[in-house]
Amino acid sequence: MQDHKIFDIPGFVTQSGFTLNVKLAYKTFGKLAPDGGNAVVIPTFYGGRHSDTEFMIAPGRSIDTRRYFVVIPNMLGNGHSSSPSNTPAPYGRGGFPLTTLYDNVMCQHRLLTEHLA
């Protein structure tokens, strides 16, 4: 069973010039305030997944979900988002294009402004 959601970004052009139909995995906690002022983004680290940061997110914890709406986007290449292991040819496996932090930030920005806003 999948414990995260997927945001599809068709035709995303990477910094290295490849065009991919990106799947950005993410998980949210808490409730977004009407003005959006309680949103907190916790980026994952290279190879890390949303589940690696969940220990600090809960009512009464350092990132209190009674107060904050938390978004944890997974990086490209981590196995949940578009990765060599789950992207169809011609970009699957060894053909997966180079992706950068810039690409990740651009995808995460789109998640926040186009999908969760």
What are these regions (language model features)?
Residues M1-A39:
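Catalytic-loop region of hydrolases
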Residues L20, T99-Y102:
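Conserved phosphate-coordination/catalytic loops
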Residues K27-A89:
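N-terminal cap/lid subdomain of alpha/beta-hydrolase-fold enzymes
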Residues F7-I9, P43, P73, Q108:
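Generic structural hydrophobic/aromatic packing signal, biased to beta-strands
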Residues F12-S16, A58-R61, R110-E114:
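Catalytic micro-motifs at enzyme active sites that drive phosphoryl/nucleotidyl and oxygen chemistry
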Residues Y91, G95, Y102-A117:
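Conserved acidic catalytic loop of the alpha/beta-hydrolase fold
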